[in-house]
Each structure stands twice: as structure tokens, then as C-alpha cells.
Amino acid sequence: MSASITAYDTIAAISTPPGEGAISIVRLSGETAVATANQVFKGKDLSQVKSHTIHYGHIVDPESGELIDEVMVSVMLAPKTFTREDVVEINCHGGIVATNRILQLLLGEGARMAEPGEFTKRAFLNGRIDLTEAESVMDLIRAKTDRAMQVAVNQLDGNLHTLIKRLRQEILEVLAQVEVNIDYPEYDTDEMTTKMLLEKAQTVQKAISNLLSTASQGKVLREGLATAIVGRPNVGKSSLLNHMLHEDKAIVTDVAGTTRDVLEEYVNVRGVPLKLVDTAGIHDTTDKVEKIGVERSRQAITQADLILLVLDQSEPLTDEDEQLIQATANKKRIIVLNKQDLPAQLDTTALLKLVSPDEIIKTAIPTSAGMDALDERIAKLFFGGIENSQTTVMVSNARQIGLLRQANKSLDAVIAGIHAGMPIDLVQIDMTAAWDKLGEITGESAPDELITQLFSQFCLGK
């Protein structure tokens, strides 16, 4: 990837979501962005204004003279823009008709409709950002919680880029020493270089392992944590869902089997995005519809990252309760011992023979008792080892994680090769492979096809 600014045609797109709103933004980027906007703008001559200024005027159809909208136009000149090209943003009134009319006028004056993610792609191709920072733009847009937003901002600020760049530089330095050894064997520095190669491989591998240790948390922040609320009928599953959502999504009655399907909702719990699944009560039934719901509930347990197993402490432990405890034994789970506001009938001693006391949170959902403790346990369960995600460098997407694992595998081969006494020029091949894989993360050695595919996932106007 070249950091020099490359000339492209001028592109245009609507950067705000479609529909009614106070303001819409139509964005242009490219060598003729200012001249194109000038053709449809009635106000100041945009070709004469200073960079990073905003101007009042009207958009007018240059052929018919029809007044389209009253607007504010921002002019930002290269290279101090997101794309490192001239950028113009037309702030018009929100609404589908006026916004589309303005876009069509710009296209009629020679601008091209931008492809999905093309503004961000140009920022990457012009050296403004690397691939990790480009991916963080979409992560920021899609962030479901404050913590997810912090991680995205952290990457956008270049923290992951800086770390990967440092690791590549460390590998490059030792590869240069290996080249000297190969080119000038008479200096007989093989032993010293081999020792340096081993130490560097171990150092870089430790840093990569530390990054990979954040992968599960990063994936949760990016995609959400699939959380199944399970239990036999009428123990308070739907009440728990409604309380966590702060609204009534599930039917709550005293009738067993009221929830006959699987309900899914997203909720933010202390910065952890939960994809809550309220399942039908798991029990033996002859009702055909209920049977389908029970089967879907069993599937939800299998697919869930976290189980909230709700038990009713106002009733004795049942065979169905024990079956659910056994079915979820190998999953991350929290035992929600509900209905603490009612007289106790459940034998706690018997329960503790089946579950750890650390798994139990006592609740009385109608009074909110224990709900703060439940939220805290969920957050601690998944982010207990990461105190401050604002400063912690994390990886969150499958592409980055996969490349880090491939780099780690190459470093394993380096270390194994050195211990096996392999020639240094053969070991060098695996060290170079690790360097290449790290470069793919930032885009420095990424193939064009990958770059095109990555940016195609972005939304229009970004």
C-alpha cells in the first residue's frame, strides 16, 4: 500500500440513513468535488473559499433553475480530510425526495455513485488509515454498548496498528541480521544470530498470545453474547427477560407453558451486549405447539454462550430442575435462584450438591432484589480480566484473529526449527511468513481481493 495520494474520479453518496429526519448529508470526495458542488450551489463561489469552512446557500437545478433546498455546505480541501482528497458535504433538510434530488444533480454534473465503503477505502488507499482502523469505523457504527464503542475508538486511534507495526519491525530487524549471515558466512555469527532469532520469535509470540487472549471478549463486544434464559415452566423466565429489557416483551402469567416459542432481544448489561433468548419452559408435554417450543429451547441451550438457569426457591427442586442442571453443566452459566420474596421450599443443601455456590445469584424479580448482583456477575464473568477496555488493545473480528493465529503458528515453526538445529535460512522462511501475516492485519501485505471484499461490507456513504 502506498501512502501517497492517488487521483481517483469524484464520488458522491448520501451519508445519513434514509427516511425522514432533521438533516441529511450528501458527501462528495475527489479531485473535482468542489467544482461539482459549485455547479448546483447558489451562494458563495466554493472554489474561492478557505478549507474547513461552512457556507449557507441553496441547491438549484442548473438546467431548469428550480430551487431544490436550503442548505449548509462544508468544504474541506486535501490533504487534511478523511479521504485525503477534496471533500464537500451538503447538509440539507432530511427526507427522501430532496436528498435524492441533490444526489442526482451531482451525478448529472459528473460525479460517480460511490460504492459501499468507498470513502473509507480511499482513506486506506491514500494512507490515511490502515485496515485495522478501517474495520474499527464499522465496529464503531455497529457498537451496541459503551464498552464496544470504547474498543472501536481505541482501534480507530491506531493502538492495534501501532502494536502490529512494532512487532513487524522487531521481526524485520532480526531478518536483516539473518540476511547478513547468509550473504557473509565468513563472519561466522550463526550462533549469535540463531540466539537472537529465537529470542525475538518468543518475544513476538508472547505479544501475539496476549492479543489472542482478548479475542473472546472482543468477539462478544462485536457480535453480542448469546444468552439463553432457561428453566421449567412458571419459574420467572419471562419476568427476568422483561426486567432486563425494562419493557414487557414476554407474556407473564401463572399459567405454565404460556411462552411457547423462543423470544430474542438485545440488552446492554454493564457494557456487555447480551442477545437474550427467553425459551419455552422445558418439560414433558403432549401439546404439539408446546413440544416445538421445548425442542427449540433445547437447541437454544446448545447454541448459547451463557445460560441463565432460573430455579424457583418457593418450590422443592424437581426432576426437571435437576435435568436442566445436568444439561447445562458444561456451559458458562449463572443459577438464578428466584422468588426470594416467597417462603423457601427448595432444599439448598441438595442444590449445592449439584452446583457451585459461586454460580448462584438470589433474586426476587418483582422487587428487583438481586438484579444488580446478576448484572455484575455477567460483566465479571466475561470481562473480569480486562479492567479498562479504553486502554486495552483488543482484537474483535475473525479476520484479525485468524491472521494472528497463523502468525503464531509460523513462530511455533521458527522455535521448533531452531531447537531441531535446522539451517538458519530455512528457519527464516517461517519468520518471514509471520511478518507477512501481521502485515495482512494492517493491510501492508494484504491482497487486493481481500481489500475489495472487506470494504464491500460497509454501508453506502461511509
From Swiss-Prot:
Known EC number: 3.6.-.-
GO molecular function term, any single one: metal ion binding
PROSITE patterns to which the protein is assigned, alphabetical: G_TRME
Co-factor: note: Binds 1 potassium ion per subunit.
Gene3D superfamilies, per the entry: P-loop containing nucleotide triphosphate hydrolases, Probable tRNA modification gtpase trme, domain 1, tRNA modification GTPase MnmE domain 2
Enzyme class: hydrolase
Span of domain TrmE-type G: 224-383
Binding sites annotated in the UniProt record for GTP: 234-239, 253-259, 278-281
Origin superkingdom: Bacteria
GO biological process: tRNA methylation; tRNA wobble uridine modification
Binding site for K(+): N234, T253, V255, T258
Pfam families documented for this protein: MMR_HSR1, MnmE_helical, TrmE_N
Co-factor(s): K(+)
Main location class: cytoplasm
Chain positions recorded as (6S)-5-formyl-5,6,7,8-tetrahydrofolate binding sites: R27, E89, R128, K462
A GO-annotated cellular component: cytosol
Keyword list, A-Z: Cytoplasm, GTP-binding, Hydrolase, Magnesium, Metal-binding, Nucleotide-binding, Potassium, tRNA processing
Sequence positions that bind Mg(2+): S238, T259
Subcellular location: Cytoplasm
Entry function: Exhibits a very high intrinsic GTPase hydrolysis rate. Involved in the addition of a carboxymethylaminomethyl (cmnm) group at the wobble position (U34) of certain tRNAs, forming tRNA-cmnm(5)s(2)U34.
Subunit structure, as described in the record: Homodimer. Heterotetramer of two MnmE and two MnmG subunits.
Family statement: Belongs to the TRAFAC class TrmE-Era-EngA-EngB-Septin-like GTPase superfamily. TrmE GTPase family.
NCBIfam families assigned to the protein according to its UniProt record, in alphabetical order: mnmE_trmE_thdF, PRK05291.1-3, small_GTP
Alphabetized PANTHER family for the sequence: TRNA MODIFICATION GTPASE GTPBP3, TRNA MODIFICATION GTPASE GTPBP3, MITOCHONDRIAL
Name of the protein this chain belongs to: tRNA modification GTPase MnmE
Taxonomic classification: Bacteria, Bacillati, Bacillota, Bacilli, Lactobacillales
